[in-house]
């Protein structure tokens, strides 16, 4: 089996259906005997350039280990789903399990906010 990194962008009006789409796509990979090493929902983000007059999209990242047939099936599902604006499937040399740069930055921001909240409460109490 080979390792793949998959990123797909969903129409912002379809953000509510992203969880179902992720479940469907991961299900098709696991049914074919593949495994999901990393799954990150980056949420709605600004795009670098407009696509179909849209400036935002819902981003999802998956790192999987699967056979080529399952990846072909997934690519076909992306192609026929109108809600998927763009997708990218790259073959990688090994499984990537650590958080991506996007998620690391998000975790750092939330940690800073959590650290700042007790300090603000202490300053208000004095």
Swiss-Prot record:
Keyword Ribosomal protein attributed: yes
GO terms assigned for molecular function: small ribosomal subunit rRNA binding; structural constituent of ribosome
GO cellular component: cytosolic small ribosomal subunit
Biological process, per Gene Ontology: translation
InterPro entries linked to this entry: Ribosomal_bS6 (IPR000529), Ribosomal_bS6_sf (IPR035980), Ribosomal_S6_plastid/chlpt (IPR020814), Transl_elong_EF1B/ribsomal_bS6 (IPR014717)
UniProt xrefs under SUPFAM superfamilies: Ribosomal protein S6 (SSF54995)
Keywords: Ribonucleoprotein, Ribosomal protein, RNA-binding, rRNA-binding
Region (Disordered): 101-126
Protein origin, superkingdom: Bacteria
Pfam families: Ribosomal_S6
Biased composition annotated in UniProt, kind: Basic and acidic residues: 104-126
Family of this protein: Belongs to the bacterial ribosomal protein bS6 family.
NCBIfam families reported in the protein's UniProt record: S6
Described purpose of this protein according to its UniProt entry: Binds together with bS18 to 16S ribosomal RNA.
Protein name according to UniProt: Small ribosomal subunit protein bS6
Gene name tied to this protein: rpsF
């Amino acid at each position: 089996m080979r390792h793949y990194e998959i990123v797909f962008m969903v129409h912002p009006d379809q953000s509510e259906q992203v969880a179902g789409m992720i479940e469907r796509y991961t299900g098709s990979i696991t049914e074919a005997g593949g495994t999901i090493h990393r799954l990150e929902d980056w949420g709605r983000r600004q795009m670098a350039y407009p696509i179909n007059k849209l400036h935002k999209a819902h981003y999802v990242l998956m790192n999987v280990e699967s056979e080529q047939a399952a990846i072909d099936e997934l690519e076909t599902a992306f192609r026929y789903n109108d809600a998927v604006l763009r997708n990218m499937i790259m073959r990688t040399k090994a499984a990537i399990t650590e958080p991506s740069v996007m998620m690391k930055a998000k975790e750092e921001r939330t940690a800073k906010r959590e650290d700042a909240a007790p300090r603000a409460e202490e300053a208000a109490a004095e």
